UniProtKB/Swiss-Prot annotation:
GO biological process, alphabetically ordered: tetrahydrofolate biosynthetic process
Name of the protein in question: GTP cyclohydrolase FolE2
Coiled coil stretches, renumbered: none
Task of the protein: Converts GTP to 7,8-dihydroneopterin triphosphate.
EC number assigned by the record: 3.5.4.16
Organism: Methylobacillus flagellatus (strain ATCC 51484 / DSM 6875 / VKM B-1610 / KT)
InterPro entries: GTP_cyclohydrolase_FolE2, GTP_cyclohydrolase_FolE2/MptA
UniProt site (May be catalytically important): 153
Keyword Cytoplasm found: no
Biological or metabolic pathway of the protein: Cofactor biosynthesis; 7,8-dihydroneopterin triphosphate biosynthesis; 7,8-dihydroneopterin triphosphate from GTP: step 1/1
Any Pfam family matching the protein: GCHY-1
GO-annotated molecular function: GTP cyclohydrolase I activity
Stated family: Belongs to the GTP cyclohydrolase IV family.
Length: 266
């Protein structure tokens, strides 16, 4: 039995648009896909990433082809690797015939940490994002890492007869790189500049240590971003960066915030 003929379906996205307005980024957002990531210990972490995928749309096209973004993800191996990140981006730009493209891949990354006194080990998680961009064939990759730390207020310590208010802070480094850099290296640059780093598991001797460590190393939010920026300045694999710190104030119902941006090429 012959299959019934299917009438042609109009491709509305390819119809002209007359408003003379190009779109800088259009695509899909918040699609999840399994990924695998190598870590500095030689292991491989299997996790799930959230992808944002965009292309540039010229002024004369009405729309892009949204389904093709999903097809590009699914055409890759079941677990996408960081090594295949550039090829996915290039495939997206080619498939959609775009001048430029942008892909973000955000996932939890785990580091095994050792408590400072007892030596007990536990996992700490960090939010990591790889941001890839292609513009007229040129590929750039940016690494973004959110690092939780402890900050202790120098003013509170100075004016108080005992104690000082302290809190957890999120330090975010967004770095355009020119060579491979381990996520752990960025984490270490941040944690070394905090009042104290945080741990998943602490025993009582460890808790005493981190409390006293933070008290002996007070930092304003301004101190944290300046000290981290000083480390990023001397890291040759980093071309430009933004470092932000948000301190979730324990004595206020608001956060303290600071940011430094630098492009070393200028």
């Amino acid at each position: 039995m012959n299959q019934p003929s299917i009438p042609p379906i109009e491709d509305v996205q390819n119809t002209p648009d007359t408003r003379q307005l190009a779109i800088d980024k259009v695509g899909i957002k918040s699609i999840r896909h399994p990924v695998k990531v190598k870590d500095k210990t030689g292991g491989v972490q299997h996790t799930v990433a959230t992808f944002n995928m965009y292309v540039y749309l010229p002024h004369n096209f009405k729309g892009t082809h949204m389904s093709r973004f999903v097809e590009i993800l699914n055409n890759n191996e079941r677990e996408i690797s960081v090594e295949s990140f550039e090829s996915i981006l290039r495939a997206m730009v080619e498939r959609l015939d775009a001048e430029s493209g942008h892909v973000e891949m955000t996932f939890p990354y785990f580091v095994n940490k050792t408590a400072p006194v007892s030596g007990v080990q536990s996992l700490s998680d960090y939010e990591v994002t790889f941001i890839g961009e292609i513009n007229k064939g040129k590929y750039d990759i940016t690494v973004k890492v959110v690092v939780p730390v402890t900050s202790l207020c120098p003013c509170s310590k100075k004016i108080s007869d005992y104690g000082a208010h302290n809190q957890r802070s999120h330090v975010t480094v967004t770095a355009l790189i020119n060579d491979f850099i381990w996520v752990e290296d960025i984490i270490r640059m941040v944690e070394d500049q905090a009042s104290c780093e945080v741990y998943g598991l602490l025993k009582r001797p460890d808790e005493k240590y981190v409390t006293e460590r933070a008290y002996d190393n007070p930092k304003f939010v301004e101190d944290i971003v300046r000290d981290v920026a000083a480390q990023l300045n001397i890291e040759t694999r980093i071309v430009s960066y933004t470092v932000e710190s948000e301190n979730f104030e324990s004595i206020h119902n608001h956060s303290a915030y600071a940011l430094i941006e630098k492009d070393k090429r200028k």
